[in-house]
Amino acid sequence: MFIDHLIIGAGISGSYIAHQLNKKGQSFLVLEKDTIDRGKQYTINYTVDDQVVNIELGSSVIHSKQETILELLKELNLHTTPLPKNEKAVYIYPGYTFEKAKEKYKALRKKLKESASNYPSYFTVEDLAREIFDKLDYEFFKWCMDAWYEYNDQNAITYFDSVKNEGEYLYISEGMEYMLKKISLPFLDKIQFNTEVKSVEKSNEGYIVKTDKDIYNAKKLYICVNLRSAKKIEYIKLENVSRYLNLGLSKECLRVYVVLNKRLDIEYGSISGKFLSKWTLRITDKVWMVTYTDGILANKLENMEIKELIRTWIDDMNNLFNKDLTFNDVVYYVSGYWDDAYAVLSKEFYKGNKVKLPDNLMITSLPKGKGENTAWIEGHLYKI
């Protein structure tokens, strides 16, 4: 079967691309492995006490850059509600403020018998937990961090439930599930559900896509799946696709924890730097996490010294928040590639290391299978 435009994945990214093609009268087909009630952007499933728990995230591979979320909301006639000024301005749980997320988290813990023993080998993120949640176990921390990271991706269509418009944060009253269903209503007949992609190959005419039902030849291919689905298919061989997958499958995300000797009175938030896309999170008022993520600039990033990256971050902080930080204000910095799970540090960096972390730098625990005195395999601790 020959198709002009073939889209893999009917989540918000795939549906948005289909929406644009449909408006232009282009012929296309969308392949979706789930049923018509696919619902959310995508979910990660993990099991606790033989019970499967779904965690909602968003498509990580490819997003449209042609239209802003506000234009799309207007086009779909979706309602937005301003965020009250006394609320936190960052949404880490889709469509909810910190307080609402806290309620959802409590409900989740109750569903899981409110037992931390459900998460063996994981500890709480104490500093962050005291300011946001009563307790914050590793799995939920990973959930929040993933969601927050995805929702502040500078390259995305901004498929989040909250969006900033002229300094004011808005959220979609109907929720993302409603948005996803509404955007695909005009072309439901062009979405082939219950279809699993088995392989993708480059051909002289375009791409050959094999599914569990048929074989398709496409002139143009749009891969709009999450990273976990992408791992099951050999997309990595495709030109201009590997860089997106590498963002989650290789060492192109560098995370740096910066410990300062002074307090910074700045709220939590996402910071986009001049040099490359950076996601900054305040762990405490003296401890900051900076994630450098840009597959395109990966080679340049790897060739830069950590100190140079930190200086770039300091410049951005000073410019954005009118601060007077210098490199001399940095006491420690810890770096590592976003490589294995989402663990970062243990209380003692690794066995035999004589340099101790400051007491207020207890970020998270270790991934399963790692020793208690082991941190990131490729992490390094530097003392200035």
Segments the model singles out, each with a brief description of its role:
Residues 2-30:
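N-terminal Rossmann-like FAD-binding beta1-loop-alpha1 element of flavoenzymes
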Residues 202, 214-267:
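Central helical "cap/lid" subdomain
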Residues 113-199, 203-206, 224-234:
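Active-site/ligand-binding neighborhood in enzyme catalytic cores
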Residues 50-119:
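Dinucleotide-binding Rossmann-like beta1-alpha1 core, especially the glycine-rich loop
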Residues 243, 251-300:
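Active-site substrate-recognition segment that forms the wall
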Residues 38, 73, 129, 183, ...:
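Generic structural signal for small/hydrophobic residues in well-ordered secondary structure
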Residues 16, 206, 279-384:
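Conserved flavin/dinucleotide-binding core of flavoenzymes
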Residues 22-48:
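Glycine-rich FAD pyrophosphate-binding loop
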